[in-house]
């Protein structure tokens, strides 16, 4: 019989950026109707899972700014999976945190999905991707994206996914002021207050927006496109109210080889795209001190073809 107490699993849990974020309307369930393109990047957290026979979920981390109790998404995800699967085992979980918190990079959602995927294997549950996505959607709107990973069209409140095929090799520079965070809920509320008169309710019009993103979303991001651009509706709210975001976007716009720049999610992290990782590294090396002096942490990374992976 397998000694389950010695079984360990390690997982890489990557962040995401939004290559398109369009707020279409308000749904009957209170969430917003969205049309997005989300892309995994190789700024990642790492999680280690080990079975315990106590039937408890125990979370530890190298990050002192995180709650490790039942309100943590990792713990919530583990308890949900354990309850739905009706098993007696628990798990000891260690999180090594690299993705900044409250940054618009969805580190918490990535960790949640990594927990579902990791414990599904650790506990030998054999749940398929569809079942994991169903559980993920009850925990958060963008968690199903991380179950699938890579680059995806995301519709509905973010849980309706369509896989995109791309081989983008862009380099990415990220900027975030470590002392600044943005509330996603508050940002959507402010956006709604300003732009609710533009919201669509007609299903045919909403489907036309989805169709347009399916057909043109990747073309808008293609290196051959002379007008390479990224749309983020939430930036209209956050940039005007947050000097840190406004300055980050300005700094990125002035980088010599920047192809385009935007805010990710509800912010405050901002990013710029470059033709390849080598160009991005050179730009960061040349500007690192400037970014630091202006109060920003900075990272350079690439796009990932896959999301959460076992290591």
Curated annotation (Swiss-Prot):
A Pfam short name: GHMP_kinases_C
Protein family (similarity comment): Belongs to the GHMP kinase family. IspE subfamily.
Physiological role: Catalyzes the phosphorylation of the position 2 hydroxy group of 4-diphosphocytidyl-2C-methyl-D-erythritol.
Active site feature: 16, 142
SUPFAM superfamilies membership: GHMP Kinase, C-terminal domain (SSF55060), Ribosomal protein S5 domain 2-like (SSF54211)
Name the record gives this protein: 4-diphosphocytidyl-2-C-methyl-D-erythritol kinase
Statement: the UniProt record of this protein carries the keyword NAD: no
NCBIfam families (UniProt xref): ispE
Annotated metabolic or biological route of this protein: Isoprenoid biosynthesis; isopentenyl diphosphate biosynthesis via DXP pathway; isopentenyl diphosphate from 1-deoxy-D-xylulose 5-phosphate: step 3/6
Originating organism: Prochlorococcus marinus (strain MIT 9312)
Enzyme class at the top of the EC tree: transferase
UniProt: ATP binding residues: 100-110
HAMAP family: IspE
One biological process term in Gene Ontology: terpenoid biosynthetic process
Enzyme Commission code(s) on record: 2.7.1.148
This protein's record includes keyword Nucleotide-binding: yes
Catalytic activity as recorded in UniProt: 4-CDP-2-C-methyl-D-erythritol + ATP = 4-CDP-2-C-methyl-D-erythritol 2-phosphate + ADP + H(+)
């Amino acid at each position: 019989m397998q000694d389950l107490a010695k079984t360990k699993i390690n997982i890489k849990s990557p962040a995401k950026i939004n290559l398109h974020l369009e707020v279409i309307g308000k749904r009957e369930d209170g969430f917003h109707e969205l049309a997005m393109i989300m892309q995994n990047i190789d700024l990642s957290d790492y999680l280690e899972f080990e079975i315990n026979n106590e039937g408890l979920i125990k979370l530890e981390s190298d990050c002192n700014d995180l709650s490790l109790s039942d309100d943590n998404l990792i713990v919530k995800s583990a308890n949900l999976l354990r309850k739905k699967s009706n098993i007696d085992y628990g798990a000891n979980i260690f999180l090594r945190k690299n993705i900044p918190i409250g940054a618009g990079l969805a580190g918490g959602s990535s960790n949640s999905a990594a927990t579902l995927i990791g414990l599904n294997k650790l506990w030998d549950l054999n749940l398929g991707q569809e079942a994991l996505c169903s559980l993920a959607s009850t925990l958060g709107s963008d968690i199903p994206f991380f179950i699938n990973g890579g680059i995806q069209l995301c519709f509905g409140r973010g849980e309706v996914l369509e896989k995109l095929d791309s081989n983008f090799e862009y380099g990415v520079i990220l900027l975030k002021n470590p002392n600044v965070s943005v509330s996603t809920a508050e940002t959507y509320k402010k956006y709604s207050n300003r732009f609710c008169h533009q919201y669509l309710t007609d299903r045919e019009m909403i489907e036309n927006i989805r169709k347009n993103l399916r057909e043109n979303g990747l073309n808008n991001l293609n290196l051959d496109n002379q007008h390479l651009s990224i749309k983020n509706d939430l930036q209209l709210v956050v940039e005007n109210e947050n000097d840190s975001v406004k300055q980050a976007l300005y700094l990125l716009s002035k980088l010599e080889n920047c192809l385009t720049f935007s805010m990710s999610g509800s912010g405050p992290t901002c990013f710029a795209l470059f033709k390849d990782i080598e160009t991005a590294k050179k730009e960061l090396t040349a500007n690192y001190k400037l970014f630091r002096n202006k109060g920003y942490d900075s990272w350079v990374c690439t796009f990932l073809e896959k999301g959460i992976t076992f290591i």
